[in-house]
Swiss-Prot record:
Disulfide bonds: none
GO molecular function list: ferric iron binding; protocatechuate 3,4-dioxygenase activity
Gene name of the record: pcaG
InterPro entries found in the cross-reference section: Intradiol_dOase_C (IPR000627), Intradiol_dOase_core (IPR015889), Intradiol_RC_Dioxygenase (IPR050770), Protocat_dOase_a (IPR012786)
Enzyme Commission number(s) from the entry: 1.13.11.3
This protein's name: Protocatechuate 3,4-dioxygenase alpha chain
Entry's cofactor comment: Binds Fe(3+) ion per subunit.
Keyword Iron: yes
Membrane-crossing segments per the record: none
Length: 201
């Protein structure tokens, strides 16, 4: 019997409705009790608690105020928690969106530990990010690294895949302080000058 392959469903841009279904708070709608959102770590989660924040810019340098991000990261011990449960002190998966006014996204999490790649080589602490936004038919994959992990960054096999050092800088979040708490700023530029490096994962 011949095998019939199903055609691939075409991708579509995120459109104006992604916030209604996945980012209720950002859309100004009542939130659900069981919501996957931007707080990956509860106060009792082990590790260094940090705030991540940033903005998304298009090729003309304008803020993309309706973008949506999904993140996947290891815990402070470098282990991925693949069983999502809102009762967990820490979950590896989270979501956030840029606000319609300031165009800024935030994540409350812990700084991830070192994870080995498939070959057993340590990768610098990082957070995987998928970006969904208007005009993007297939979401974009990037990574966030930390500027105070210079030694680990210099040895990271993934960062070193990027030949130009100045391009690697587009993946480095800058440490800062927000309301007395440790934070890292990571702005994403979809295209144009200073375009963020995206991966074909």
């Amino acid at each position: 019997m011949p095998i019939e392959l199903l055609p691939e469903t075409p991708s579509q841009t995120a459109g104006p409705y992604v916030h209604i279904g996945l980012a209720l708070e950002a859309a100004g709608n009542p939130t659900r009790d069981q919501e996957i959102w931007n707080r990956l770590a509860k106060p009792d989660a082990p590790g260094e608690h940090i705030l991540l924040l940033g903005q998304v810019y298009d090729g003309n340098g304008h803020l993309v105020r309706d973008s949506f991000l999904e993140v996947w990261q290891a815990d402070a011990n470098g282990e991925y928690q693949d069983a999502y449960n809102l009762e967990n002190a820490f979950n590896s998966f989270g979501r956030t969106a840029t606000t319609f006014d300031a165009g800024e996204w935030t994540l409350h999490t812990v700084k991830p530990g070192v994870v080995n790649n498939a070959a057993g080589v340590p990768m610098a602490p990082h957070i995987n990010i998928s970006l969904f936004a208007r005009g993007i038919n297939i979401h974009l994959h990037t990574r966030l690294y930390f500027d105070d992990e210079a030694q680990a960054n210099a040895k990271c096999p993934v960062l070193n895949l990027i030949e130009q050092p100045q391009r690697r800088e587009t993946l480095i979040a800058k440490r800062c302080e927000v309301d007395g708490k440790t934070a890292y700023r990571f702005d994403i530029r979809i295209q144009g000058e200073g375009e963020t490096v995206f991966f074909d994962f």
